[in-house]
Structures are given as structure tokens and as C-alpha cells.
Amino acid sequence: MPAFFVTGTDTEIGKTTIAAGLLHAARSAGLSTAAAKPVASGCEPTAQGLRNGDALVLLGQCSLALAYEQVNPLAFAPAIAPHLAAREAGVELSAARLHEAVREVLALQADFTLVEGAGGWRVPLLGRENLSDLARLLALPVVLVVGVRLGCINHALLSAEAILGDGLALVGWVANVVDPATSRLEENLATLAERLPAPCLGRVPRLEEATPAAVAAHLDLRPLGIGL
């Protein structure tokens, strides 16, 4: 069943917003959905344990019954880079450990599954490992979320180059307009469309309420081989 790894050009560029929109679009098409965000920092303490807002959003778009711990098995309180948060907590943040956790979700064989990374493609894990090593172990096709703002062309092209260089397929990208005041917005988007070696799945404007349904209205899953 189709499964994809979602990465971004940076942190705070709307990966979860776009991932939730993609999941909503798949659910609206009658597909069963599942998701994983294997590691997250900046989690809030609750009576049930640490909870991450982004992971909860993804959980809300899963049609299959998943426990929070399946979606987000490694949660850390400090809002810092995951490898630093893990080090402070005395937790071994290895690609192999994250891989085992994600495989549990993939084994559910939902019609449409997303695995969302943290930050960008080269976020550090244990030792010399990066989050990209998890993506390589999973061997999933990649969807790149481009946070459209000043500098995004360089970030997007470098990310695409790294993804392809790691031997993975870049199967789509989404333009998420995080700064609508970006100079030469249309020309920047045209350059991205020309230079990125994958189809654009949609252009999401800055929305007053970026609900999964509102975001899904701007997305197209057909380039991923999912007919709607």
C-alpha cells in the first residue's frame, strides 16, 4: 500500500500542516490512512505523558485506530533539536530504533501512510547518523514540503539533491506559502517548478485557518499514483 516519507526544506515551514492535508485528501477519497512522526521535541506534559501538537494533528487524520505512542514513539519536552533532547534524556536516538517503531505502523498496511520527519533532511540523530538514514532504511518515496519564503529555492534544490543522492525517489513537492509577502513570488514558484525533478502536488496559500480540510482543497494526490 502507498507510503511516503515527508520532509521539508527547514523547520517551521508547515510539514505537519501539509501532511495532515494529504492525509485528509486520502481519507476523503475513501482510503484508510495511518501516520507516524517517530521523533518529536517540544512536547507538552499531560496526564497521559508527553504529547506533541504536530503528532496529535497527524493522529487526528488517521482512519485506523492507532495509539499515540505508535504515531510518536519518542517524545521529548525541550523545544530543541531532537538529538540534543535525546542526549539530555539519556535516550539512544538511532535510525535503527526509529525504523523498528515506524515498521509497526507500516505493518498495518493502510491504503495511504505518511512518515513525517523532524526539521529537514539532514537533522542529526545518534553519532554520525541523520534522519535521512531513517528514510534510507525505510526506502520510501519522498514528498518535499517547500516553505516558500526568501531563500527557499536554494533550500529546495539542495534538499532535492540530497534526497536523490541518498538513492531515494523524490515523487512530489508542495509549495507552502509561509510568507505571502515574498518578493517575486510567482517567479520563485516558476523556478521551483522548472528546477525540481518531481511534480508539484499543490500550492497552499497562507490560510487564516489551516485545517486539514482547507489545506487538502489545494492538494492533488494524482501525481502520487492515487486517483481521486
Curated annotation (Swiss-Prot):
Mg(2+) binds at T16, D54, E116. Its cofactor is Mg(2+). The keyword Plastid does not apply. It catalyses: (7R,8S)-7,8-diammoniononanoate + CO2 + ATP = (4R,5S)-dethiobiotin + ADP + phosphate + 3 H(+). Homodimer. PANTHER family: DETHIOBIOTIN SYNTHETASE. This is ATP-dependent dethiobiotin synthetase BioD. The lineage of its organism: Bacteria, Pseudomonadati, Pseudomonadota, Gammaproteobacteria, Pseudomonadales. The gene is bioD.
